[in-house]
Amino acid sequence: MSDKVIIFDTTLRDGEQSPGASMTKDEKVRIARQLERLKVDVIEAGFAASSEGDFQAISAVAAAVKDSIVCSLARANDKDITRAADALQATNAKRIHAFLATSPLHMAVKLRMSPEEVLEQAKRSIRFACNLASDIEFSAEDGYRSEMDFLCRVVEAVINEGASTINIPDTVGYATPELYGEFIKTLRTRVPNSDKAVWSVHCHNDLGMAVANSLAGVKIGGARQIECTINGLGERAGNTALEEIVMSLRTRKDYFDMVCGIDATQIVPASKLVSQITGFIVQPNKAVVGANAFAHTSGIHQDGILKNRDTYEIMRAEDVGWSANKIVLGKLSGRNAFKQRLQELGITVEAEADLNVAFTRFKALADQKSEIFDEDIIAIMSDSAAAEEGEHYKFISLSQHSETGERPKSRVTFRMGDREISSEAEGNGPVDASLNAIEGIAKSGAEQLLYSVNAITSGTQSQGEVTVRLAKGGRIVNGVGTDPDIIAASAKAYLSALNKLHDPSQAKLNAQMTP
């Protein structure tokens, strides 16, 4: 019988550490619900001690999720661990994930603690955590660069104190597959009580080997939990990509002889949702979830596919959630057809009032473009959910004028608090003019780090999805806006980013590197 691999998703915590990928409480809940539909075993919802916003988001996820374990990260101290436990009160399936650095470099430079002090703190923190929850994970931060003898002592000690999962991260993405697998194997062999805990791997992608290292940790090392994120989202070069792990285990079951409980048909919906919320576009050639992942342009390849799909495809697009439904909705489509498509996309609308709002937005978009695709519907639902969050800034309308040889002018009407404001400005282009009009009133003083446009579907009728990244006071936020009018989408994206800057609960604790 095949071994079970636990899928631990940290999109909402480690994935959110990507510059600009900060998510609101409601956005985290929406992603968590999709992760639950994906049948993820453990959802790491955040770092409770890092901010009041993260604490509230973890609490909301804990209340919303019913079928997955909900986890909070914590540094290995009583204050952080208590905060994590408090945030998880709404769920009976909770995990506290405590971490402490164990490499010589981190202990000396960052912690300024001796190895013996680190060992005692690790033991003390796990002992304390076990009084607050029964499911405790310990991460040896920068574990792969730790000295083997010392790491064995720490791991043995925390298992004795009650840790049920031991995570050995490659925090800086330094490992290579065979060496990492052997490292985990050696640890499990040398730690006397290694059979009392589940061993976990957490790899970063700095050298492009996060997925390979994680799989080696399982195949060679004997780990049975993989920590990963949707789309490989994460700081620096990212984390292990969940979709690649799941489909590797599934497609090469003959080699790995392991299974996971993931519903693979929910992979693409999860990928699209995370991309839309964070504003991080999935590269077209990204494995499994990229737009070109199942595209064949070579004539020889196309001929082979037409004769037998197995000639050039090792998995089917529909297996990972690419829609095979060719029925396109339009302005004549009714409410039932719209509701049915939502169900097919795995989108749950609990209240009739929310469905009515979404359907109204659908009809408004259908008046602007003749065909509504799945990607359009996902964007509609994202906009509807954002509107429910009680934004401080809210787009109302826009008009602009431009002629060759003249500076474009734009007039933007938006709501700021309880006031409706119209503002005019000029700029180097219609987008610049529109954002200048908003900034002239908002006076945020934020630095614009990124402006990007992505067509949601193909063709000139496609909605534009605009991402604006702003920085202020050490915080970096992304705003996303969609509209068939690129100028309007740009204004919406800018206002979306301003909303995140305006919310003080979203300010993060800039404490230290995490696993």
From Swiss-Prot:
It catalyses: 3-methyl-2-oxobutanoate + acetyl-CoA + H2O = (2S)-2-isopropylmalate + CoA + H(+). The keyword Transcription regulation does not apply. Its cofactor is Mn(2+). It is found in: Cytoplasm. One of its GO terms (biological process) is L-leucine biosynthetic process. SMART domains: LeuA_dimer. Keywords: Amino-acid biosynthesis, Branched-chain amino acid biosynthesis, Cytoplasm, Leucine biosynthesis, Manganese, Metal-binding, Transferase. One of its GO terms (molecular function) is acetyl-CoA C-acetyltransferase activity. Mn(2+) binds at D14, H202, H204, N239. Its EC number is 2.3.3.13. PROSITE patterns: AIPM_HOMOCIT_SYNTH_1, AIPM_HOMOCIT_SYNTH_2, PYR_CT. Residues 394-515 are annotated as: Regulatory domain. GO terms for cellular component: cytosol. Residues 5-268 form the Pyruvate carboxyltransferase domain. The keyword Acyltransferase does not apply. Pathway: Amino-acid biosynthesis; L-leucine biosynthesis; L-leucine from 3-methyl-2-oxobutanoate: step 1/4. Homodimer. Catalyzes the condensation of the acetyl group of acetyl-CoA with 3-methyl-2-oxobutanoate (2-ketoisovalerate) to form 3-carboxy-3-hydroxy-4-methylpentanoate (2-isopropylmalate). PANTHER family: 2-ISOPROPYLMALATE SYNTHASE 1, CHLOROPLASTIC-RELATED (PTHR10277:SF9), HOMOCITRATE SYNTHASE-RELATED (PTHR10277). Belongs to the alpha-IPM synthase/homocitrate synthase family. LeuA type 1 subfamily. This is 2-isopropylmalate synthase. It comes from Polynucleobacter necessarius subsp. necessarius (strain STIR1).
